[in-house]
Amino acid sequence: MTAAENVCYTLINVPMDSEPPSEISLKNDLEKGDVKSKTEALKKVIIMILNGEKLPGLLMTIIRFVLPLQDHTIKKLLLVFWEIVPKTTPDGRLLHEMILVCDAYRKDLQHPNEFIRGSTLRFLCKLKEAELLEPLMPAIRACLEHRHSYVRRNAVLAIYTIYRNFEHLIPDAPELIHDFLVDEKDASCKRNAFMMLIHADQDRALDYLSTCIDQVQTFGDILQLVIVELIYKACHANPSERARFIRCIYNLLQSSSPAVKYEAAGTLVTLSSAPTAIKAAAQCYIDLIIKESDNNVKLIVLDRLIELKEHPAHERVLQDLVMDILRVLSTPDLEVRKKTLQLALDLVSSRNVEELVIVLKKEVIKTNNVSEHEDTDKYRQLLVRTLHSCSVRFPDMAANVIPVLMEFLSDNNEAAAADVLEFVREAIQRFDNLRMLIVEKMLEVFHAIKSVKIYRGALWILGEYCSTKEDIQSVMTEIRRSLGEIPIVESEIKKEAGELKPEEEITVGPVQKLVTEMGTYATQSALSSSRPTKKEEDRPPLRGFLLDGDFFVAASLATTLTKIALRYVALVQEKKKQNSFVAEAMLLMATILHLGKSSLPKKPITDDDVDRISLCLKVLSECSPLMNDIFNKECRQSLSHMLSAKLEEEKLSQKKESEKRNVTVQPDDPISFMQLTAKNEMNCKEDQFQLSLLAAMGNTQRKEAADPLASKLNKVTQLTGFSDPVYAEAYVHVNQYDIVLDVLVVNQTSDTLQNCTLELATLGDLKLVEKPSPLTLAPHDFANIKANVKVASTENGIIFGNIVYDVSGAASDRNCVVLSDIHIDIMDYIQPATCTDAEFRQMWAEFEWENKVTVNTNMIDLNDYLRHILKSTNMKCLTPEKALSGYCGFMAANLYARSIFGEDALANVSIEKPIHQGPDAAVTGHIRIRAKSQGMALSLGDKINLSQKKTSI
């Protein structure tokens, strides 16, 4: 018998503050009390029997005085009582009193009330005594013809259970149920009958389905789901049946029930690899995503589409459905949009890239018309990155994309503008034919850029790629326009002197006294000192940045001016024009230096920026060929090398992914003789319905699922010692959002232990769902207790507690055995993830909790230590492999991971190997961990410290 078929008893809480009733008082209430008293007494009897009391003297009393009553509440309680009361003698023979009970069952099966009949039939499903069931078989059969569907469907369940447990009692059950199914009209009755045939006589079920295969679409959804399950199981066991039933699955794709459509699509994919079948299933998935309102459903179905894409043969079919997949972008949820865009990007080809770009451009324009929202900004970023990737993969599309995206350089959202700038920088370097277009568009939006970071990037691009005399002059004009009147210091002093004009004076409104909640006076003024003055609003952008004290942009400007001046000198032969242009560039640098040294800016210029601007002045004053090469050639080559390395890294990553996806089994993989299949082939060989059932019951583990030979015994935690009167050990089963403790409790004494209770408490972000119920342990007996602990976040948690019990017949106080602590491993909740460098830096700046861990290890190789940290923390290294290759005595790497609760974890590894200590010197350094929550940062730090201790031993 499987775990799913075991009897599940209802646990009833007993108030401990009242005295347990005596058998005599209960007998008196059951014999002489009214209906209410008998009801209460029967409840107490049930609770006492559940807690281990025998009460044999009350059995005949209940049969004589309670069983004949017609009260519905008492009848329901009696069903519970007959389920739990011992029905056999110690030697296993049926009690004589149960013959009387059997007669009562028969009368209830013929009762005019359909609820009593149905409840009795449900109760009979739980009986394990064939002697009790045998006299009832005619009455159970008769219930199949009852007028009410509630009775009929429970009669089917009773017949199925009896046939499964005691086939000799009703050997013709499959034939009986088949005849019932043919004439039945009620959907729930047909569903139960069909389900029985699936498990009892699958051939008969298939024959019935063949007779009504054209009417399947008219059936109710509960019956359609069972039909899908039958077809899946039949074809899984016997592939030759596929041709017989695949048309039925196609028809069920048109069902009105989303659940049926989803299951039918999943079954169709397993039955056939034909392009038409894959296309029909994918189209069904897409329709479900669009029509379903629940975002969780959308994400689940999207995952099924992504699984389809992983198969090389299916990927080609899905490429034709890219435009249909993009319809999902109408969903406002960001996570759904993110997955959809990634899927579309993976499927895009030269055949449909043009249509994809048109749709994405429309989506980008739509984000302009939507009111500003955090998700809108993030969605715009996703669109920009997708268009960026499309343009890199399909260069012909870049010319269509650039004009639309360039407008976002002036966007208030700096993150989206930064993504556009990154795309423009890559496009202008890769595509020579687009340089003129990009420079032209850049000059158009240059004056409207609001962010200093974007302004710096735009300056660099213009300085690097303006190659004609006209473009260089246009750049100089834009810079002068953005800088305003020069010299800056003199013009600003003049403005300050004439600043307070009547129309610009700030007027102060009348002062009003207010009384606060504490009874004190508060003064309210109409003066708004934070309002920017008209003078500040009218400042040109570059001038505003400089007066705010941001002189890093000035250093970038000096480099740009130097580049275009050197290029202008090379292009123009007239000495006068050369000198004039160079002098103008030097004047701009000098006036910025003057401003930086004055008291006008909010923050003074830094020494680094002064050095950079001074260096540029010196380069322009000398104009040496060496400096010309450095500024106009080496800079561009550096960018080219960086982009090439990035592209190579992406190709390598894609190659690894494709190899991992395409190779089902390696030649040197070990064979698991238990299954005779490769480990990574097992998923497709398993019955998916059985797998989902096991997952729902919590019988599969994420780590063990990959290897069927892995044992649960590896995770057993001993809670008490072998010399303790009660021995306990637990298997910690970690699910996604909860932990199940399966505790084995063994009574090692010769006494009966009563009220043996497992008392648990938690430390950290853990919560005990329910308190385990007390139990009674016979001498040297054992029992399993399960406890559920809910997990709310990724934080090191501790479960501790004790076992308390009473010794039968002893007058002493309760005994207590203290349990060892159970430490919950956070690695079960952390998964490697990836993000861009910009996102990493942004999160690093935003996260407020930092944990600095000092490296303490015996390891002598930097790369080995990094690999050890990655394995210990389950994080992903974002630093490219090429950047970590070679040996120079020190290493810096960025790590990233996400928890299943959506928490981000960042780490920066900064390590070195002291050369002066010789080749056997241990690795030293620090690991800085940053997270949004304190628990995450501390937990990861503890994990690293623990792993370092293990390596140091």
UniProtKB/Swiss-Prot annotation:
HEAT repeats lie at residues 96-131, 132-168, 240-276, 277-314, 316-353, 396-433. The keyword Cytoplasm applies. It holds the Pfam family Adaptin_N. GO terms for molecular function: structural molecule activity. It is a peripheral membrane protein. Keywords: Acetylation, Cell membrane, Cytoplasm, Cytoplasmic vesicle, ER-Golgi transport, Golgi apparatus, Membrane, Protein transport, Repeat, Transport. It is found in: Cytoplasm; Golgi apparatus membrane; Cytoplasmic vesicle, COPI-coated vesicle membrane; Cell membrane. The keyword Cytoplasm applies. The modification N6-acetyllysine is found at K494. SUPFAM superfamilies: ARM repeat. GO terms for biological process: endoplasmic reticulum to Golgi vesicle-mediated transport; intra-Golgi vesicle-mediated transport; intracellular protein transport. The modification N-acetylthreonine is found at T2. GO terms for cellular component: COPI vesicle coat; endoplasmic reticulum-Golgi intermediate compartment; Golgi membrane; plasma membrane. The coatomer is a cytosolic protein complex that binds to dilysine motifs and reversibly associates with Golgi non-clathrin-coated vesicles, which further mediate biosynthetic protein transport from the ER, via the Golgi up to the trans Golgi network. Coatomer complex is required for budding from Golgi membranes, and is essential for the retrograde Golgi-to-ER transport of dilysine-tagged proteins. Oligomeric complex that consists of at least the alpha, beta, beta', gamma, delta, epsilon and zeta subunits. Interacts (via C-terminus) with HIV-1 Nef; the interaction is direct. Interacts with CAPN8 and PRKCE. Interacts with SCYL1. Interacts with COPG1. Interacts with ARF1 (myristoylated); this interaction is required for binding of COPB1 to Golgi membranes. Interacts (via trunk domain) with ARF1 (via switch I region); the interaction is direct. Brefeldin A induces dissociation from the Golgi of the beta-COP and presumably the other coatomer subunits. This is Coatomer subunit beta.
